[in-house]
């Protein structure tokens, strides 16, 4: 019986060793551009430095997926002011290419919704309360050509998260990454990874 079990395992390992895979190129080839620009993601209905932190995580994932030079252009307001326009339309795309010398640029936003405080009773007898805050966080980004203003790629990702505490200012939640919030770091890193999936090569079984 034992010998039969060993033989079965050996056959399974042998079969696994025969499986072949092929590398599938990324759905979006960013290396077609000499240089790309990145506008700081705009934070919607939230205060703090969440926009800057989310932009940096997105930048890290893009450059990890494909080795392409990325120029950080600044906030949406600063970029639009620099080119004398008020929105990211075709004229803005052409102007950004001329002013910053990039062939395409990323622009998008990050939003936090469904912010709900939670209070958990640690133990029935201890009467110790722990306050947490649950929320949904979404990130949407598009890649725009500066040659003709066309949208070359767009995607969005949503994730639920929970942090220890969230401040409120003027009725809007305040997220501060400077507070070394590990939970928020993990949420931002995961959503940035999901959002940049099209830039990564994948492995497919033959």
Regions found by a protein language model. Give the residues of each.
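Short, solvent-exposed mixed-charge patches
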Residues: 204-206
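N-terminal segment of the mature soluble domain
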Residues: 33-35, 40-114, 140-146, 150-154, ...
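Structural motif
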Residues: 10-13, 28, 97
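Short secondary-structure boundary motifs at beta->alpha junctions and helix caps
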Residues: 130-138, 144-193
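Bacterial Sec signal peptide processing site at the extreme N-terminus
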Residues: 15-33
């Amino acid at each position: 019986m034992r010998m039969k079990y060993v033989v079965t395992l050996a056959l399974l390992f042998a079969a696994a060793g025969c499986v072949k895979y092929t590398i599938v190129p990324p759905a979006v080839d960013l290396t077609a551009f000499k240089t790309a620009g990145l506008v700081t993601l705009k934070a919607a209905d939230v205060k703090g430095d969440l926009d800057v932190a989310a932009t940096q995580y997105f930048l890290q994932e893009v450059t990890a997926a494909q080795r392409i030079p990325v120029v950080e252009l600044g906030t949406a307001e600063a970029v639009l002011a620099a080119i004398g326009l008020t929105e990211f339309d075709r004229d803005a795309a052409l102007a950004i290419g001329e002013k910053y010398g990039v062939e395409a640029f990323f622009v998008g936003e990050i939003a936090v919704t469904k912010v709900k405080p939670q209070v958990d009773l640690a133990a029935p007898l201890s009467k110790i309360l722990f306050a947490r805050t649950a929320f949904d966080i979404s990130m949407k980004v598009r890649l725009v050509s500066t040659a003709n203003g066309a949208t070359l790629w767009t995607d969005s990702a949503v994730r639920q998260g929970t942090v220890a505490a969230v401040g409120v200012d003027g009725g809007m939640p305040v997220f501060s990454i400077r507070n070394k919030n590990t939970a928020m770091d993990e949420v931002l890193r995961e959503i940035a990874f999901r959002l940049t999936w099209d830039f990564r090569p994948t492995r497919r079984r033959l």
